[in-house]
Curated annotation (Swiss-Prot):
Family per similarity comment: Belongs to the tumor necrosis factor family.
Residues on Extracellular side: 102-280
Span list, region Disordered: 20-70, 117-155
Name of the featured protein: Tumor necrosis factor ligand superfamily member 6
Paired cysteines (S-S): 201-232
Pfam families per UniProt: TNF
Oligomer status and interactors: Homotrimer. Interacts with ARHGAP9, BAIAP2L1, BTK, CACNB3, CACNB4, CRK, DLG2, DNMBP, DOCK4, EPS8L3, FGR, FYB1, FYN, HCK, ITK, ITSN2, KALRN, LYN, MACC1, MIA, MPP4, MYO15A, NCF1, NCK1, NCK2, NCKIPSD, OSTF1, PIK3R1, PSTPIP1, RIMBP3C, SAMSN1, SH3GL3, SH3PXD2B, SH3PXD2A, SH3RF2, SKAP2, SNX33, SNX9, SORBS3, SPTA1, SRC, SRGAP1, SRGAP2, SRGAP3, TEC, TJP3 and YES1.
Topology in membrane: Single-pass type II membrane protein
GO BP term (any one): release of sequestered calcium ion into cytosol by endoplasmic reticulum
């Protein structure tokens, strides 16, 4: 029995993943032609194995990490230099401002001084033209004062005084031969102190006086006098002081002196025995 061999073969499909067709996208299954004749006694070929599954698409690569920005060493130093320059410029501007302020102040003072000087000059010129000259400047009056201290080598009357060393003072008054000479008439306060002392008391009367000499008077004029009686205990050591002081109207050329009754009993220490005056 003959079998008909003209029955159609089943369609066979080939897959070509690498081939590309202008009208089909990649990976499309194309059918094989059905008109391929089968040979006699040829068996039907086994069906082709199924195509292997397509590998999964590779994972998308991660984007590269951004590189850290490189630090620019020059930026730090440049900023520091700019800051220093800014402060230097600021200090210079401040100094310039202070200098201008001082200059303005000095110019203002100079202008005021010139104005006051011109006003004084104008006033003096007007006074000269009118005939009323400005009064002369007042002279500072020299103070009339004297303070003399005891002189240990004094051996005669009237008492001599120290007028150079120690705590002495002479101004506007002369000292001549134990006396103070008045140069200007006026009111004066005259004072004198004498310190007496002895090893053994004899109770001799002691006197202390200030007197004045002037060519107008025929004899000495006693101004002040002090007398001491019974001032100590007989036979014992003793010390006593006598002080005189008063205000007098003295005239020019008056000479003032001090006299005591017992010169040998006088202690001439500068703080104990002295003579002076001053004008009121």
């Amino acid at each position: 029995m003959q079998q008909p061999f003209n029955y159609p073969y089943p369609q066979i499909y080939w897959v070509d993943s690498s081939a590309s067709s202008p009208w089909a996208p990649p990976g499309t299954v194309l059918p094989c032609p059905t008109s391929v004749p089968r040979r006699p006694g040829q068996r039907r070929p086994p069906p082709p194995p199924p195509p292997p599954p397509l590998p999964p698409p590779p994972p998308s690569p991660l984007p590269p990490l951004p590189l850290p920005p490189l630090k620019k060493r020059g930026n730090h130093s440049t900023g520091l230099c700019l800051l220093v320059m800014f402060f230097m410029v600021l200090v210079a501007l401040v100094g310039l401002g202070l200098g201008m302020f001082q200059l303005f102040h000095l110019q203002k003072e100079l202008a005021e001084l010139r104005e006051s000087t011109s006003q004084k000059h104008t006033a003096s010129s007007l006074e000269k033209q009118i005939g009323h000259p400005s009064p002369p400047p007042e002279k500072k009056e020299q103070r009339k004062v004297a303070h003399l201290t005891g002189k240990p080598n004094s051996r005669s009357m009237p008492l001599e005084w120290e007028d150079t060393y120690g705590i002495v003072l002479l101004s506007g008054v002369k000292y001549k031969k134990g006396g103070l000479v008045i140069n200007e008439t006026g009111l004066y306060f005259v004072y004198s102190k004498v310190y007496f002392r002895g090893q053994s008391c004899t109770n001799l009367p002691l006197s202390h006086k200030v007197y004045m000499r002037n060519s107008k008077y025929p004899q000495d004029l006693v101004m002040m006098e002090g007398k001491m009686m019974s001032y100590c205990t007989t036979g014992q050591m003793w010390a006593h002081s006598s002080y005189l002081g008063a205000v007098f109207n003295l005239t020019s050329a008056d000479h003032l002196y001090v006299n005591v009754s017992e010169l040998s009993l006088v202690n001439f220490e500068e703080s104990q025995t002295f003579f002076g005056l001053y004008k009121l």
